[in-house]
Amino acid sequence: VRDLCDKMGILVIDELFDVWQCSKEGVNNESFNEWHERDVVNLCHRDRNHPCVIAWSSGNEVPEQGMKNLHHISQTLTDLFHREDPTRKVTSGCNNANAARNGFGDTLDVYGYNYKPWAYKDFAKDRPHQPFYGAETASCVSSRGEYFFPVDWNKGKGFYLYQVSSYDLYAPGWANRPDVEFAAQEDNPNSAGEYVWTGFDYIGEPTPYNLDATNALNVPEGPEREKLMAELKKLGDRAPSRSSYFGIVDLCGFKKDRFYIYQAHWRPDLKMAHILPHWNWPERKGQVTPVHVYTSGDEAELFLNGKSQGVRKKGTGEKDRYRLVWEDVKYTPGTLKVVAKKDGKIWATDTVTTTGKPAALTLKPDRNEIKGDGYDLSYVTVAVRDAQG
C-alpha cells in the first residue's frame, strides 16, 4: 500500500495503536506493556524510507487522553518514535474535547482532532506553537442513489429502511456534513487539513443502524454522552445492515454524490458540476423535489425542460457556501440541466434525464485481458439502458 502511496502522492500518517493499556469498550491490548517498544521499532524500520509517510501516529481515540496519570504513556511512545526516526513528527487522533488542555496535547508534536471543528479557533489561539489538523473528520453517512423526502436539514434525519438519504446532509450526533468541516478548515488556516472518515465504505460499523458503544467516546462524559447512548439504544442492532455508510465511494467502487462536493472543494480549478438527485420520480409528479448542485464554479442556473428555475450564487452560510440549492423545484419528467459559471463565464454543465423502460444491459470490463492463473480479476460494470441508451 505504501508503495502505491509513494507513486500516487498520497500523504500517509502511519498509525500504530488503537488501544494502549486501557480497554476500549471491552477490547484491550494485554501485550501492550511487553510489546509496545518493539512495535514502534518494527513500524519505523519498515516504513521510515517511504516518502509518503509524513508523520507517525501513536494511537487513535485512546481512553488515556483523559487520564492525567497515564499521559506518560503517550510521552514514552513519542520519545520512541523520535529515537527511531528523528526526521518526523508524532501525532495522535484525539476525540476527547479536553485532551488539548489537560496536558495530553503536550506529549505530541502535532495535535490531531477527531470531529471537533468547533475547537480549531480556540486551539490556534491558545496553542500557537503547536500544529494541528483534522485527524478524522465528517463521518457523513449516505447510500448511493437513495433519496428520501421531504428533505430535512437536521443531520439526525434522512434514515429509512436501512438506507441513508444521499443529499449528504446527515451524520451521527458527533459528526457533521462535509460543509461544516470545509468551513472550519477555511476559517482556520492554522489547520494543516483534514483526513475524512471515510474514503470508501467498509464491512462493519453500520452506523446509524447499529448499537456501537464506541460512538459514545466521541462526546464528553455526562448528559451529552448519556443522551447519545440513549439514542443508540433506541436504534438497537438493526440487521440486515452490515456495512458502513461513511464512504465517499461505495463498496463496489462507485462514487456517491458526496464524492463531487469534495471534488468541487478540493479541486477548484477542475471544471465540474454535479446534479442530485436522479430524475426518476413517477410517484412525485407535481411535488417539491429539491435539487442540489456541487460545482467548482461560483454560481449556476438550473433548467427543467428548458425552463429556468433560477440562478443561485455561493454565499457565506452553511446552506450555500459549498453547494447550490433549489428548494422549490416541482418534479416533472424530462431533463434537468445546470449551467455553472465562474467569474461570469460558463464553467461547466451537467444534466440528468428521466429514463424510459429498461431495454438492454451493457457490460463494461475494467480490462479486457486477465491472467489465467485463477487469481487475476476483471471488474465488470453492468448498466441498465433504456431505448435511448
Per-segment meaning from a language model:
Residues 1-346:
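Extended substrate-binding grooves/exosites of carbohydrate-active enzymes
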Residues 325-330, 351-353, 364:
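Generic structural detector for well-ordered beta-strands
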